[in-house]
From Swiss-Prot:
It catalyses: L-glutamyl-tRNA(Gln) + L-glutamine + ATP + H2O = L-glutaminyl-tRNA(Gln) + L-glutamate + ADP + phosphate + H(+); L-aspartyl-tRNA(Asn) + L-glutamine + ATP + H2O = L-asparaginyl-tRNA(Asn) + L-glutamate + ADP + phosphate + 2 H(+). It comes from the Bacteria. Its EC number is 6.3.5.-. This is Aspartyl/glutamyl-tRNA(Asn/Gln) amidotransferase subunit B. Heterotrimer of A, B and C subunits. InterPro entries: Asn/Gln-tRNA_amidoTrfase_suB/E (IPR017959), Asn/Gln-tRNA_Trfase_suB/E_cat (IPR006075), Asn/Gln_amidotransferase (IPR018027), Asn/Gln_tRNA_amidoTrase-B-like (IPR003789), GatB (IPR004413), GatB_C_1 (IPR042114), GatB_Yqey_C_2 (IPR023168), Gln-tRNA_amidoTrfase_suB_CS (IPR017958). Belongs to the GatB/GatE family. GatB subfamily. Gene3D superfamilies: 1.10.10.410, GatB domain, N-terminal subdomain (1.10.150.380). Keywords: ATP-binding, Ligase, Nucleotide-binding, Protein biosynthesis. Transmembrane segments: none annotated. Allows the formation of correctly charged Asn-tRNA(Asn) or Gln-tRNA(Gln) through the transamidation of misacylated Asp-tRNA(Asn) or Glu-tRNA(Gln) in organisms which lack either or both of asparaginyl-tRNA or glutaminyl-tRNA synthetases. The reaction takes place in the presence of glutamine and ATP through an activated phospho-Asp-tRNA(Asn) or phospho-Glu-tRNA(Gln). The lineage of its organism: Bacteria, Bacillati, Bacillota, Bacilli, Bacillales.
Amino acid sequence: MNFETVIGLEVHVELKTNSKIFSSAPAHFGAEPNTNTTVVDLGMPGVLPVLNKRAVEFGMKAAMAINCEIAEHTKFDRKNYFYPDNPKAYQISQFDKPIGEHGWIEIEVGGKKKKIGITRLHLEEDAGKNTHTSHGYSLVDINRQGTPLIEIVSEPDIRSAEEAYAYLEKLKSIIQYTGVSDVKMEEGSMRCDANISIRPIGQEEFGVKTELKNLNSFNNVRKGIEYEEKRQAEVLKSGGIIEQETRRFEEATGKTSLMRIKEGSDDYRYFPEPDLVDLFIDDAWKERIRAEIPELPDKRQIRYINDLGLPAYDAMVLTLTKEMSDFFEATLAAGADAKQASNWLMGEVSAYLNAEQKELHETGLTPENLAGMIKLIEAGTISSKIAKKVFRELAQNGGDAEQLVKDKGLVQISDEGALRTIISEILDNNEQSIVDFKNGKDRAVGFLVGQVMKATKGQANPPMVNKLLLEEMNKR
């Protein structure tokens, strides 16, 4: 029996506000444990929450960016559960009246585009963080408690691990462009749970789903889904049944393990938050927030293709992160050719960032010095080979490309007289290569070009070397 996989993703994104959603405590990552907290976060008797307007506006902006309808009337609810990192024993969330509904984003997998529906986007507060020690006790940090979150719930439209990966990449890119979050999974500002079920191909009814947690990277989302597909298929083929449960992805083994039997919404005993009034969003407020949304990646891609003449693949890669796309645009503004700038950013720059595990702003590279280097290549001042050395120096230490080339003596040798002298000396010392060339062995030319480049430390103008080398050999 062959099965079809059905996947829905729940993505939590921390909003980049200065303070928490219901208290005045700072909402910044990385502080000492239990320093970013107030009596509201600790759930002390008699304290009242105050809604952070900026968090609401960030939620509206994110919802609009993923094509959600914004609610005119929304409210907050209490989600009741007990856990050490939840001092109040309830979480303030949204249940039946979320701030955004009925959205979608478009993904592309294997050259095919597909719309993935968004059921809802709602606001809520984050919980604290437990750290389990090897001494039999746990440490609780309340810093994260009360940090504003949006939860984005997809429709069960995803059919493979690859589609899930593409959805997360696209969602991260869109949220990043809006500026409402850093969406850094390594810092916990973007987290994902996956609901996975399988059903016989052709069956309309959904199978029993399992919820998968502890997915701390896009790769782990993919691996977790792939494992769970196989596990559920093996259970059904052996005559077993799938239980509705929550499972943990174990990164060390690549497998999933049981955490708990899955709760339903009734288990949380939702009821309206009595300490917060309902929220009404009028058209004027919506339009003001909509006007703040910048150009999003899909529109930017189209502009790069139509206005700059870039291939679709280049446009997609350049717009995947806002930092890269903004850097590209600033490089063009500094005078660089669009295709050359694209090639450098997608090639040498991306390779350097991956190898060094850095982001652009953490290097010495600027749009101005990258554009300056590209202009030196176009002017013939430096070769592409020398440009790679210049790039690494700029990336590591910054500075001006033209001044660096002068200081390091890296100017390309394009003087015909100087090159002829060098070529003549090399030909005098490699007479057999001349014989080989005249006998039709083209490899001899490559060898001699290499000797010239070696003698000039890679600074000779390659096209000119080829031209002069052929001229000099034909004279002999």
